[in-house]
């Protein structure tokens, strides 16, 4: 069970009964030092539901041949995971932690046990799926765009989930290899896009991080993109 300060930090998406909330909090686990296997192999995403307390994660949907077909960014205050009891050898998601990540995790073992006691939990499950719907739909639209726009969209989504002081240049702790894995774009093509954007003065490359030096200019790259489900440019806090 987590302490009272962490309990108050959780946003449940919908109003839940005091009984269910208390039972959920009783099985909540704080995850602060995630192993590489938990992140890279997405074990934590397939073994329950997690609330992002700090940091950012990207969730990528893959086909069985490991080709990325969709990706979304989840930041502080967001939920992700798989609460389906169906055990399958095929695990379609992989996740990448951007910077330091802290989670409050609810294991499937505990969630399924609680579901037998209180059907209200399914209302909560439904709210979690609705919470990511717009991101997944926008991600599907982005897959039809060219490489440059897909990379820019990812960078702006990451910026939207980065806490900034007024006037501060966003620093995204991500490598070009990670961008390749997340977007499904070949590493060489990602390098070409990043170099082009740097040449235009829109970003600056450092070791394992990228500074977004011109957010407005990057945003212009998406002017002709259909952002009807989600526009990260409107969500950047700066």
Short names for language-model regions:
Residues 120-184:
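Polybasic "coupling" helices that flank or enter modular domains
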Residues 28, 46-47, 170, 188:
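Short loop/turn microsegments at loop-to-beta-strand junctions
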Residues 37-99:
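Cyclic nucleotide-binding regulatory domains
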Residues 1-2, 83, 128, 145-152, ...:
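Long cytosolic regulatory regions associated with cyclic-nucleotide signaling
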Residues 71-128, 134:
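Cyclic-nucleotide recognition modules
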Residues 1-38, 80, 84-86:
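Cyclic nucleotide-binding regulatory module and flanking cytosolic helices
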Residues 49, 71, 103-104, 171, ...:
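A residue-level structural signature of the nucleotidyltransferase/glycosyltransferase Rossmann-like core
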Residues 160-238:
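Phosphate-/nucleic-acid-contacting segments
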């Amino acid at each position: 069970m987590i302490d009272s300060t962490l309990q108050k930090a959780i946003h449940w998406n919908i109003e839940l009964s005091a009984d269910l909330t208390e039972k959920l909090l009783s099985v909540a686990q704080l995850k602060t030092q995630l192993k590489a296997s938990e992140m890279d192999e997405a074990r934590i995403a397939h073994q329950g539901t997690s609330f992002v307390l700090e940091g950012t994660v990207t969730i990528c949907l893959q086909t069985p041949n490991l080709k990325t077909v969709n990706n979304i960014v989840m930041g502080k205050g967001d939920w992700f995971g798989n609460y389906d009891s169906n055990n399958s050898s095929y695990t379609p998601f992989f996740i990448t932690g951007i910077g330091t990540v802290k989670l409050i995790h609810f294991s499937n073992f505990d969630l399924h046990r609680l579901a037998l006691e209180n059907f209200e939990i399914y209302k909560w499950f439904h709210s979690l799926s609705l919470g990511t719907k717009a991101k997944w739909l926008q991600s599907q639209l982005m897959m039809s765009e060219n490489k440059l726009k897909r990379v820019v969209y990812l960078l702006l989504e990451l910026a939207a989930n980065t806490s900034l002081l007024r006037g501060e240049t966003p620093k995204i702790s991500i490598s070009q290899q990670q961008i390749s894995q997340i977007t499904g774009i070949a590493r060489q093509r990602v390098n070409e896009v990043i170099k082009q954007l740097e040449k235009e003065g829109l970003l600056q490359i450092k070791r394992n991080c990228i500074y977004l030096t011109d957010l407005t200019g990057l945003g212009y790259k998406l002017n002709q993109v259909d952002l009807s489900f989600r526009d990260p440019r409107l969500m950047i806090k700066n």
